[in-house]
Every structure is written in C-alpha cells, then in structure tokens.
C-alpha cells in the first residue's frame, strides 16, 4: 500500500500523476514513484524515498518526463524496508510489464520461488515485484492478451491487491485488477484516470466507475472496458461524484484536521437532515423497515479504531433506549474467533472509507453466517456500501486528515438515529420521548459550533502547557469511558504522547500505580448519575500528584475544586453527550501536536484507510 494513480490521454502524464499522488498523501507513505510511456518508446521509471517533493524535484514537477500514459504510486512499506529500490513501480526483467500495487500478497514467497526456477531475477524485497513477474510469465507462456495474463495471475495470488499494469506491446493502455483493495476509474473528454481514492481525480472528472472484487479493466483514452474473472466483458454504469473539489482543500486553515473539526456542525446537520424529515426519522434510503427492526433480537457493532469507539458509545444508547442487547467487536478479532451469532442479529459495520480490510472481512463472515448487515460508511460506492444489505451514508464529505474528526461525529449521529428508531418500533420509548430526542438531536450542530467558538483558544493555551507531557490518562465511566477512549486515541495518534484510556473504576486495579507528580489525567464527567464517583477517582489521582483536566457539562462548577483546568460543554440529553464532549478532546490532541511542531495531518506510521490486515 498506499496510493495508486494512473492517466492516459492527450496531455503530459507526469504532472497529472504527481498532482493525483499529492491528493493521496493523507493515506501515509514512505516513498513514491512514476512510470510513464511516450507512445511506442521505452518506459521512464523514476522513484524517490521520502516525501513526494523529492520525486517532484527529480522530475521538475513532472515536466521533464515525456509521455501521455503513466502510473504512479506512494508506498507504505509492508514487504521490504522503505527505499528507492523497493519503491514502485516495478517491472519485468525485459521491461515488457510495469506495474504498481496496493495490498499484500500472502503467498508471494512460494510464487517467487516458482518464478526463480523459471529464470526470473528479483531485485527488491517486495511482494509487488512478484506480481509483476507472474503476470509477465503468463503473458509470455500463453501468448494471449493482457487480460488473459492478468486473469491467470489473479487466480494464483492469495491476498489483497489493486494492480495497475502497463504492457510495452499495448502503448497508451493501462490494465487494472482488484481484490479487496480499493480502486476507482474515471473518464472525461477523451481522457481516463485511475486512483485509489476520489480526491486524486476529482479535479479532472466527476464521472467514475467502481471496479468490483475479482474484476479487471482495460483503460484507454476516454474508454474503459470491464471484465470478470473469466475474461468476459461486463457492463457498468458511471456514477457522479457530488463532492465539491474545494471541499478537499484547506480553505485557509493551517491543517486539514482543524478545518475538519470546524466542519463538524455542517457534517452532523447534513447527516441528520438526510434521515429526519418533518420531525420523523425516515430510514427508507437506508432500506431498513419497521418490520425488519421488529425481527432483530441482537446487535453486533464491528469496527476498528475511532469507529470502534463509536460502537462503544452506541452500545450504551441502543441498550438504554431500545433495550436490545449489543456487542461491540474489534473487526480484527471478530473474524478469527468463530463467534457465536444470533441468526436474528444485525451486524453493523462502521467504516469511514468503506474499505477497511478487517471490517470488510467481518462483513463477509457475517453474511456467510446468514446475518443481516448494515454499513455506516462515508464513501458512496465503497466495498462495504456495495456488499452490505443496508447502508447508512454519513455526509461528512471528504476527510483528508489521517485523524478522523467529522467522520467520527457523523457516525455517532447515525448510531443515535438508528437507536431512536429501534426504540420507537420496539415500543421501549413513548411517542413524546421520541419527539424530544429528535428535537434534541437537531440542536447538536449549533452546540458543537458553540464549543469550537468558545473554547478553542483556552484549549490551545492549555495544550501548549502540556506539550512536553510524557504520559496522559483519560478516565470516565459508562459513555464517558467511550469518550475517553476516543480522546486518548486522538492525542496519541497526532501528538505522539503516550496516552491510555481507562474505565475510572479500574484505576484502583493497577493503573493508579503509574500516577506520579505531574502526570496529566483528563477526567470526562458528562453523566450526572456517575459524576460524583468519577470526581472521587480524580481526587485519588490528585493526591498522588496528578495534574487534572476536567471535562463536564455546564452546572457542575464544583469540579473546579478538584481539577486544575476545566472545559464545560452545553447540556444535552445524556445519550448524546459523546457528540459534544469529543470536540474539546479533538482540539486538545490537535493543539498539542501543533505545539510540538509535528505533521498533524500525516502522523508517522499511520494511513487514513487501512486496506490490508
């Protein structure tokens, strides 16, 4: 992994490829490369270790590389260390086949040994070079078309891949193959584009095709032909991307992360407006009927990272409002433990990209076991969106920063909407309560906006004071524990401070031994019935020298007797406090990172969309 672009048309390819790769930088990478052909000429391959600027400088921003057909790649090392040698593209021994690849080929070692016996030489430590030479082997063995050769290779590769391949015998053409790794293709005015994600080609076209699992495509100027695994042509309809290209730009903000924090009120409002019409929840676009809901006796929420924290908060809301049992599962664990599942259960898969490898695998496992599946995703046409029985689209728009903010917030309100509708249909709340909850939901965007406007500068000041913190502990009870988990992750991933989140009641069972003079402890106290208990936990920490931050609702002013710094959030229904309390914690993580001079939008070792296991 991590990012692929491709172009064939009438313009110089290299500048288009570099621009596309720049729009995929948020996915994380350690090296980059281009392969460009000028008509029937040889392929120019240029690679560079480090930032994309190194590659741009090598190629004079692409202007020194002739040719109108090419592929590009940003690599994040999975097989072989970060180096120019291991960077993509890779080519066959005679240069006939050149390719870039995202994913992991699990049986690359046995394939490599087979190819060595056939006379192939390997120069890198990557699994991608194996894929390139496997395609070349079958191309020469059967003397068929590129589609034939790729087909033979696909059935022998185990693992995940998105491949973009050029053949010397077919100038001006790019061939694409996909299994469990995202890829989109676009067409506009006699030109064609390929990319791992929409922002890379949004400047050039809004007309895109989604290539399915175990499918191939032949990409020519302004023309794309799709094939199934048997090599038969298949028909697809283009989809129109509704995103505004400017939505993927910083719009005057210093970083995407702070821009996306500010975009949360609109993202939440848009998501709510998509399913609340005239004061009533309408799930017709989701495809979930009242009859479907009555049939469901158990909910499983399966996700990774921040989406898992959404599930943790949603568990409390579903169980308390709808009185339906909920289990929250890490997708990376779910598929490997042969879980016992209620056949009348609903599996909710939460994923911003809709391509998260472990979540996608959990979805498929659930479907194989006969359970109904529902995806909460942000990307229209993504794998999870296509394969789930029902889809709840969040309307966050493009989220560029690796650390999620607005997508997380829209996932939360999607979960609230589902929980409220389940409660209504199952008769566990009154009509009056149903109406109250919907009214309160619709106040969240303005309350989020108020927090950002009122507390941003104070939190920035506090973050600057804590920039040298070695450790930070986030504690809370109930929903506040779920909020603490997300706050901890935010600070950890963007500021590189070692942070942990704990259920406050667990402090006595070992963790309190880590508290010493000056240790930063953040207490989340938004639940009135748990407030006093969490305050007592903070007092215990303070007595051991901790420096305390309290995050609570307006009215709990006695927290200032204990905490050294306090942030208040507006009152809301206790089921919805996550949506408000998470915002100061997002700002805290952001401003600590800024104070340390770090790359906020592209934290080290992280990728936006984890498309391999």
Positions of PLM-derived features:
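Glycine-rich oxoanion-binding loops at beta->alpha junctions
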Residues: 68, 72-85, 275-290, 314-350, ...
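Glycine-rich phosphate-binding loops that contact phosphosugars or nucleotide phosphates
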Residues: 294-436, 440-443, 524-568, 588, ...
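Active-site phosphate/pyrophosphate-binding segments
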Residues: 264-268, 272-300, 390-520, 593-613
